[in-house]
Amino acid sequence: MIVNFISALGKQVIDFFRALGRAGFMLFGALIGKPQIRKHFPLLVKQMHVLGVQSLLIILLSGLFIGMVLGLQGYVVLIDFSAETSLGQLVALSLLRELGPVVTALLFAGRAGSALTAEIGLMKATEQLSSLEMMAVDPLRRVIAPRFWAGVISMPVLSILFIAIGIWGGSLVGVDWKGVDSGSFWSVMQNSVSWSYDILNGFIKAVFFAVAVTWIALFNGYDCMPTSEGISQATTRTVVHASLVVLGLDFILTAIMFGAG
C-alpha cells in the first residue's frame, strides 16, 4: 500500500518535471531565433485582436460590476466609522493591487486561454503543424510565437481597462448613489495611490500572469493528444492549471512586493 502510494507519487513528480521541460523547450524554440518582423507582425496584430479585443466585453462588464460591488460593500463598512470619504482609496487600492490583475488573468484564462488551447490542439489534430514542418516552416515561430506575444501584450492592457472601469463603477455607487463627496472621493484616492508602489506593482503582476496563462494555454494545446477527447481534456487543464498558477503566483508576488511593508 505505502509502496504503491510512493510509486504513484514519484510518477506524478517525474511527469510534472517532464512536462515542465517540454514546455520550456517549446517556449525557447518559439522565442529564440532570428526575428522576422515583416512576416510575424501581421500575425501578431491579428492575434492581439482575437485575444485582446474580443475579450473586451467580458473584461469591461466584470470590472464595472466588481467596482460597483466594492463601492457598495466598502461604503457599508466605512459609514459605521464615519470614514466614507476613504471609499475611493479602498476601491482603488483593492483593484490596483489585487482584483484588477488577478480577476483579469482568471477571465483571460477562461476565455482566451481555453480558445488558444483548442485552436492549437485542433491544428495538431488536423496535421496543420506537421504540414508546416514539411514546407520547412517552423511551427513554433509561425504559430506559437505570435500568439504568445499577443497574449503577453493584451492581458496587461485588459487589466488596466478593468481597473479603470472598476474605479468608475465604484464612484457610480459611492458618489452618485450613496452621496459621498466627489472631491473627497477622488482627492483621497489620488493622495493614497503611489505610482511605484501600487500602479507599477499591479502592472508587473499583470505581466507575470499574462506570461503564465499564455504559456500554459499554448503548451497544453501543443502537447495534447491529437483527438477530440485529448483537445477537450487539454482545454480543461488549461483553465484549471492557469487559475491555480495565477492564484499561487499572486501570493508569491504579493509577499515580495507588499509583504515587507
Curated annotation (Swiss-Prot):
<comment type="similarity">
    <text>Belongs to the MlaE permease family.</text>
</comment>
<dbReference type="InterPro" id="IPR030802">
    <property type="entry name" value="Permease_MalE"/>
</dbReference>
<dbReference type="InterPro" id="IPR003453">
    <property type="entry name" value="ABC_MlaE_roteobac"/>
</dbReference>
<feature type="topological domain" description="Periplasmic">
    <location>
        <begin position="34"/>
        <end position="49"/>
    </location>
</feature>
<keyword id="KW-0472">Membrane</keyword>
<dbReference type="InterPro" id="IPR053408">
    <property type="entry name" value="MlaE_Permease"/>
</dbReference>
<keyword id="KW-0997">Cell inner membrane</keyword>
<feature type="transmembrane region" description="Helical">
    <location>
        <begin position="199"/>
        <end position="219"/>
    </location>
</feature>
<feature type="topological domain" description="Periplasmic">
    <location>
        <begin position="169"/>
        <end position="198"/>
    </location>
</feature>
<feature type="topological domain" description="Periplasmic">
    <location>
        <begin position="260"/>
        <end position="261"/>
    </location>
</feature>
<dbReference type="GO" id="GO:0005548">
    <property type="term" value="F:phospholipid transporter activity"/>
</dbReference>
<feature type="transmembrane region" description="Helical">
    <location>
        <begin position="50"/>
        <end position="70"/>
    </location>
</feature>
<dbReference type="GO" id="GO:0005886">
    <property type="term" value="C:plasma membrane"/>
</dbReference>
<keyword id="KW-0812">Transmembrane</keyword>
<feature type="topological domain" description="Cytoplasmic">
    <location>
        <begin position="1"/>
        <end position="12"/>
    </location>
</feature>
<comment type="subunit">
    <text>The complex is composed of two ATP-binding proteins (MlaF), two transmembrane proteins (MlaE), two cytoplasmic solute-binding proteins (MlaB) and six periplasmic solute-binding proteins (MlaD).</text>
</comment>
<feature type="transmembrane region" description="Helical">
    <location>
        <begin position="148"/>
        <end position="168"/>
    </location>
</feature>
<comment type="function">
    <text>Part of the ABC transporter complex MlaFEDB, which is involved in a phospholipid transport pathway that maintains lipid asymmetry in the outer membrane by retrograde trafficking of phospholipids from the outer membrane to the inner membrane. Probably responsible for the translocation of the substrate across the membrane.</text>
</comment>
<keyword id="KW-0813">Transport</keyword>
<dbReference type="GO" id="GO:0043190">
    <property type="term" value="C:ATP-binding cassette (ABC) transporter complex"/>
</dbReference>
<feature type="transmembrane region" description="Helical">
    <location>
        <begin position="239"/>
        <end position="259"/>
    </location>
</feature>
<keyword id="KW-1133">Transmembrane helix</keyword>
<dbReference type="GO" id="GO:0015914">
    <property type="term" value="P:phospholipid transport"/>
</dbReference>
<dbReference type="Pfam" id="PF02405">
    <property type="entry name" value="MlaE"/>
</dbReference>
<feature type="topological domain" description="Cytoplasmic">
    <location>
        <begin position="71"/>
        <end position="147"/>
    </location>
</feature>
<keyword id="KW-1003">Cell membrane</keyword>
<protein>
    <recommendedName>
        <fullName>Intermembrane phospholipid transport system permease protein MlaE</fullName>
    </recommendedName>
</protein>
<feature type="topological domain" description="Cytoplasmic">
    <location>
        <begin position="220"/>
        <end position="238"/>
    </location>
</feature>
<feature type="transmembrane region" description="Helical">
    <location>
        <begin position="13"/>
        <end position="33"/>
    </location>
</feature>
